[in-house]
């Protein structure tokens, strides 16, 4: 009888641990793929960039003034989600284009300082995409590289 109770308690404990780990895994996966804080507005992102990198304000203002900061949208063929990007042509014609991709929970505006270097200093065309569920792109979760087209 005593052995049977020990087996029952151990089985229940193992089941509880496995259930807790499974629940925790799904919770963390949902938390990491759908964070609430990554949806800054364009104005909030620009304010941050002008505060942290004041040298890009005249550049961005001049791009907006001449219409060189172009919003581009495409629809992903994989899941028909609208994806947003900024495209900035170089001041002189060139075949060089830099695709500059932001990191986890960031957006295209918050990497403009790198775009400045490629466009202003090196003379490249630049494409700054907002990945799915970031910035102005749509989607219901962050993609981690799989099924991204």
Language model feature labels by segment:
Residues 95-103:
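Short beta-strand element of the alpha/beta-hydrolase
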Residues 105, 132-149:
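Catalytic nucleophile-loop/oxyanion-hole region of alpha/beta-hydrolase
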Residues 3-4, 87-88, 112-113, 140:
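Short amphipathic alpha-helical segments
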Residues 104-118, 138:
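The serine-hydrolase catalytic nucleophile loop
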Residues 1-57:
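N-terminal membrane-anchoring alpha-helices
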């Amino acid at each position: 009888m005593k052995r049977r109770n020990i087996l029952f308690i151990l089985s229940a404990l193992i089941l509880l641990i496995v259930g807790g780990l499974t629940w925790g895994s799904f919770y963390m996966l949902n938390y990491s793929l759908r964070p609430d804080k990554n949806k800054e507005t364009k104005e909030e992102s620009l304010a941050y960039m002008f505060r942290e990198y004041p040298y890009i304000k005249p550049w961005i203002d001049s791009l907006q003034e001449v219409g060189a900061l172009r919003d581009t949208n495409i629809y992903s063929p994989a899941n028909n989600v609208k994806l947003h990007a900024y495209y900035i042509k170089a001041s002189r014609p060139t075949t060089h284009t830099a695709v500059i991709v932001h990191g986890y929970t960031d957006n295209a505006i918050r990497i403009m300082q790198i775009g400045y270097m490629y466009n202003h200093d090196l003379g490249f065309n630049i494409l700054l995409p907002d990945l799915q569920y970031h910035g102005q792109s749509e989607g219901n979760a962050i993609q981690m590289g799989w099924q991204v087209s």
